[in-house]
A protein has these predicted regions:
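Solvent-exposed polar/charged
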Residues: 24, 58-59, 123, 156
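A conserved pocket-lining segment of Rossmann-fold NAD(P)-dependent short-chain dehydrogenase/reductase
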Residues: 32-45, 55-79, 83
Length: 183
């Protein structure tokens, strides 16, 4: 997406372009990735478009019915926080002579819609329920994003590969949140 409409997207592209400028003009070793939605068991959801994918786990662990603000069938790329941290470290440690794209590496891990994550959780929490109450603003933002990102350059230039898929992330999220919310 080269013409983003959200403040996050605008500032991200601005940073990428400034980083390219400083690399080309002054030789500053700049590097950046384009993260998908990040799912964390440490940071609670803050109301962003992709935060439904964190909030749904909290609802499952608390035994609450989840009210999904994104409509069924809306695919979005997501990544578990341990993979995001690992990607940042891998890129920082990468051989600079092999980096062609430097400041605009797409990285991907998994792409799913609300139904898919719901069913992944339901395998472990059989009584879990979900209903939809679509937030028009969040849905517009979600609809403006690609369904999936091509991370071929990151894989080829610095060996990016995620460790988590939806199933392994779900097991870990449920385990960590059960422990966290017990306190």
């Amino acid at each position: 997406i080269q013409r983003p409409r959200t403040m996050y997207g605008v500032t991200k592209v601005t940073t990428e372009l400034l980083s390219d400028y400083y690399f080309n003009k002054y030789g500053v070793d700049t590097r950046a990735v384009r993260f998908p939605g990040i799912i964390s068991n440490v940071t609670p959801p803050g109301g962003g478009t992709t935060d439904y994918a964190v909030d749904i786990y909290y609802s499952a662990v608390r035994g609450e019915k989840f009210v999904c603000p994104i409509k069924e069938g809306t695919l979005m790329d997501m990544m578990y926080m341990p993979d995001a941290l690992n990607a940042a470290i891998m890129l920082m440690e990468a051989d600079p002579t092999k980096l062609i794209h430097r400041n605009a590496f797409n990285i991907a891990s998994m792409s799913f819609d609300p139904e898919t994550i719901f069913h992944a959780i339901k395998k472990h929490v059989p009584a879990f329920e979900m209903i939809y109450d679509v937030d028009p603003l969040k849905q517009r933002i979600a609809d403006s994003w690609p369904d999936s990102l091509d991370d071929t350059c990151a894989r080829e230039e610095w060996g990016w590969k995620p460790a988590y898929d939806l199933e392994s992330m779900t097991v870990d999220m449920l385990e960590k949140l059960r422990e966290k919310l017990k306190k």
